[in-house]
A protein has these predicted regions:
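Hydrophobic positions on the alpha1 helix immediately C-terminal to the Walker A/P-loop
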Residues: 45, 49
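Walker B catalytic acidic pair
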Residues: 115-116, 139
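Dynamic helix-loop-helix/coil hinge segments at AAA+ ATPase domain boundaries and subdomain interfaces
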Residues: 1-10
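C-terminal accessory regions
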Residues: 276-347
Length: 347
């Protein structure tokens, strides 16, 4: 049995008392919020608690990358929330539509553990709660809130809060740097394991071009960098072409699209009556599933906000996904470059 700190032990006792009170029945709430900074042991505590539950415990996260990280940390069969509680209406693998899966594995679970809970919006949160299964949600108060949506579980105060970073976790470069930032210390340029802190004038543009994901602070920088990276990759024109990387801007439950999800354009888009019709493959989907979408070209020219909502709501919304703002993408488990809105990619 691992040795827990007094803070962690108090959190374990609080969750155990909540479970003993039979959440969803009586006065115990259905949701327990276990929050803490990176490296404080949220996942470790969740795994330990799961071992003491008599019955099925399920682990899930908003993104596929986060679910994979949970698996690597020992959370067996961790999945995306979407795959856990929704099912395809038909067997058409090329274009399935989804609905709430009332008989899903979640329906008879004794506990569901949700990671990166700040990304869960009201609709997804209510669908999770509809199974009336106790929800242990894990969150990090240091994460920036999503620009839109999300925050369904983080609107309330934590039931237990972890602030002490483990000694082992302090050796992780990302955790170490995040601690310095929270303490108000300036980052010192240098190498921290596989992580580098560099000044703007010393940044190698090749590192930016080779990164899995580029993150910046402002939308104006995001648009400029997306244009440059597309140009450097040989993609001409203002509109998407086959091979382009896109990010979803609005949920579409029926198609299995979620705000912040990344996709790749698989075929040349077909413009029709000022509408782009595209076939996309979800970036984190290991199947051959294709999604047909209809998108206004204004999404890619920066003019989508000029359209009235009754016009916009009939279509899916995407933008180029090579560069995202830190609000849009907070999954640090990629090989990426986090920029400070400076010049990183040459003209």
């Amino acid at each position: 049995m691992p040795a827990f700190s007094p803070e962690q032990d108090a959190a374990l006792k609080a969750v155990a008392a909540w479970l003993k009170a039979k959440p969803g029945r009586g006065n115990a709430p259905l949701v327990f919020r276990l929050f803490g900074y990176a490296g404080t042991g949220k996942t470790t505590l969740a795994k330990h608690l799961a071992q003491g539950v008599k019955g099925k415990v399920l682990f899930a996260a908003f993104t596929g990358k986060a679910a994979l990280v949970m698996r690597r940390k020992g959370c067996e069969e961790a999945s995306t929330i979407h795959s856990l509680i929704y099912k395809a209406l038909d067997n058409n693998a090329q274009q399935p539509r989804f609905e709430l899966w009332n008989d899903s594995p979640a329906s008879d679970a004794k506990l569901i553990v949700i990671d990166e809970c700040s990304m869960v919006d009201a609709e997804l949160g209510r669908d999770l709660q509809s199974f009336n299964v106790p929800l242990l949600v894990l969150g990090d108060p240091a994460q920036l809130p999503p620009i839109q949506g999300g925050g369904f579980f983080t609107d309330g105060q934590p039931d237990a809060m972890l602030t002490e970073v483990h000694r082992q976790a302090q050796n992780d470069p990302i955790v170490r740097l995040s601690m310095d930032i929270r303490a108000g210390r300036r980052l010192i340029p240098g190498e921290y394991g596989d992580t580098q802190v560099v000044t703007r004038d010393r940044l190698d543009p090749k590192r930016v071009l080779g990164a899995d994901q580029v993150l910046v602070g402002r939308n104006v920088t995001r648009r400029a960098y997306n244009a440059r990276l597309r140009e450097r990759r040989g993609f001409a024109g203002a509109l998407p072409v086959a091979g382009d990387k896109l990010v979803c801007l609005r949920n579409n439950r029926r198609k299995g699209l979620f705000n912040g999800g990344l996709c790749v354009v698989k075929e040349r888009p077909k413009p029709r009556r000022q509408i782009l019709r595209m076939r996309l493959h979800p970036d984190e989907d290991i199947t051959d599933r294709m999604i047909k979408v209809s998108v206004r070209p204004e999404c890619f020219t920066g003019q989508i906000e000029q359209l009235d909502w009754p016009v916009r709501k009939r279509f899916d919304e995407f933008d180029f996904g090579y560069v995202l703002t830190v609000h849009r993408q907070q999954d640090i488990n990629t090989s990426g470059f986090n920029g400070n809105d400076g010049e990183a990619v040459p003209e």
